[in-house]
């Protein structure tokens, strides 16, 4: 009997355990997390999602299936490729711009950023950058909670070159980070390495011959039964990259500074009909028409300083008018600072902390404000080959938006919000970086009552000494 009772008790215990293990036998206890809302943003009337013990779709899955809306309202919208719109709305749906205009109707559930009295621009693009993302495969190697990424967002940067990939500054997530893998085909065409130059030309000529034979075969295969395609087994590695260049599937990139190097690059691009981006080009102003006719694109720093060669009988050296002269010749420009990283030292505008200030210095050299803005937005996107997705505020493009408290090229302007893929990635009021600077948003531009060189109020003993030596005590 004792053994029988023990067996019955053991069987009853197994039955109870099996009943508890059945799905739907008890309500889910996992808490539902709601996205945090910024104090300076509001969310239009949203209906909370509820769960019941019998449902098979979790709250997280339902949230992923639901459309995600964000609207920037009441701002002065600079579309860059179109007109400036006063008191307009930019509405995004699932990270893509869905509508722009003064009379956009918002959906019931929509996160709203009120930009009344503020300026709205497309996200800035750093065509040359380091230290924001990982050098290779940014989704796996980037610190999405790092200070460098946050500081870059505070400067309005939403897209940057990461190694050879183009990536978004998706703070806190790696979702939809990579815009374009393998942005460039790197070329070495230095005047100091004649053997490499000769080899590159020979390789390009071989690929061009192959493409011509392939075109001939495509024309003749319908009428000639004995037509044979050219051998393509060798089209791999560097030759596959060159094939993409000559078929305009890829963009080349190289460093070139002097007049002679720039002439050689322009000749190479014209001869083999491919698009090339030159980095540096501080003497580009001396051959600007040649670069423009060859379709060369350039990544430059307007304040790059190089003294002219006194022994040369032609124009040499750098000039602050470089950007202006290149742009007038039809060269597509991307402006970057001299130090294309995030640093916490140096003068304003010398690194990616103030990409906009480097563009402002190009205005000092004669570039128009509109073209300077293009050089850090849509034209920078064209240099990277991603202008179909970023660089301007247009319906169908990624919702990368910067909201700031003044003209983007003004040295006192601060970014209020940076939006990446339709999500607020930076909010000035919520981060400690600049929250203490003009927290109420009021800005008074200082008025200087002196002229350069400034006349200072020197102590009496200094002015007396200056007078003794014939100086001016003013």
Model features per residue range: what roles?
Residues 135, 251, 292, 301-304, ...:
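His/Asp/Glu-enriched, well-ordered alpha-helical/loop segment
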Residues 1-11:
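Bacterial N-terminal signal peptides that target proteins for export
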Residues 206, 212-277, 282-298, 317-330, ...:
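Histidine/acidic residue-rich metal-binding segments in metalloenzymes
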């Amino acid at each position: 009997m004792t053994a029988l009772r023990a067996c019955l008790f053991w069987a009853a215990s197994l039955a109870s355990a099996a009943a508890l293990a059945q799905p739907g036998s008890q309500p889910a206890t996992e808490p539902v997390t709601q996205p945090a809302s910024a104090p300076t943003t509001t969310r239009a009337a949203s209906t909370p999602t509820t769960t019941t013990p019998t449902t098979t779709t979790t709250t997280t899955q339902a949230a992923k299936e639901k459309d995600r809306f964000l609207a920037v309202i009441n701002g002065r919208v600079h579309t860059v490729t179109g007109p400036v719109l006063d008191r307009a709305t930019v509405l995004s749906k699932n990270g893509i711009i869905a509508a722009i205009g003064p009379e956009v109707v918002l959906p019931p559930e929509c996160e709203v950023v009120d930009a009344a009295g503020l300026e709205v621009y497309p996200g800035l693009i750093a065509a040359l950058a380091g230290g924001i993302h990982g050098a290779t495969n940014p989704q796996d190697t980037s610190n999405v909670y790092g200070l460098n990424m946050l500081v870059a967002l505070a400067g309005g940067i939403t897209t940057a070159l990461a190694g050879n990939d183009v990536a978004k500054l998706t703070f806190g997530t790696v979702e939809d980070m990579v815009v374009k893998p393998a942005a460039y085909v790197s070329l070495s065409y230095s005047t100091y390495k004649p053997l490499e130059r000769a080899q590159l030309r020979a390789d390009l000529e071989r690929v061009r011959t192959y493409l011509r034979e392939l075109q001939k075969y495509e024309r003749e295969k319908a009428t000639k039964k004995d037509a044979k395609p050219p051998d393509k087994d060798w089209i791999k590695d560097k030759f596959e990259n060159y094939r993409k260049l000559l078929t305009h599937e890829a963009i080349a990139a190289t460093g070139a500074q002097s007049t002679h190097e720039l002439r050689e690059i322009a000749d190479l691009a014209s001869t083999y009909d491919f698009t090339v981006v030159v980095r540096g080009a501080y003497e580009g102003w001396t051959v600007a028409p040649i670069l423009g006719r060859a379709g060369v694109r350039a990544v430059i720093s307007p304040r790059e300083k190089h003294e002219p060669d006194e022994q040369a009988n032609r124009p040499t050296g750098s000039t602050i008018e470089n950007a202006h002269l290149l742009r007038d010749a039809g060269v597509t420009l991307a402006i970057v600072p001299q130090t294309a990283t995030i640093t916490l030292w140096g003068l304003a505008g010398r690194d990616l902390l103030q990409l906009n200030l480097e563009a402002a210095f190009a205005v000092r050299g004669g570039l128009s404000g509109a073209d300077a803005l293009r050089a850090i937005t849509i034209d920078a996107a064209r240099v990277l080959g991603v202008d179909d997705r970023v660089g301007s505020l247009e319906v169908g493009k990624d919702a990368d938006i910067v909201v700031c408290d003044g003209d983007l090229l003004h040295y006192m302007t601060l970014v209020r919000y940076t939006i990446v893929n339709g999500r607020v990635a930076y909010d000035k009021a919520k981060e400690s970086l600049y929250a203490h600077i003009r927290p109420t948003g009021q800005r008074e531009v200082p008025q200087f009552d002196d002229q350069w060189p400034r006349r200072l109020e020197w102590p009496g003993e200094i002015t007396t000494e200056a007078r003794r030596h014939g100086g001016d005590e003013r």
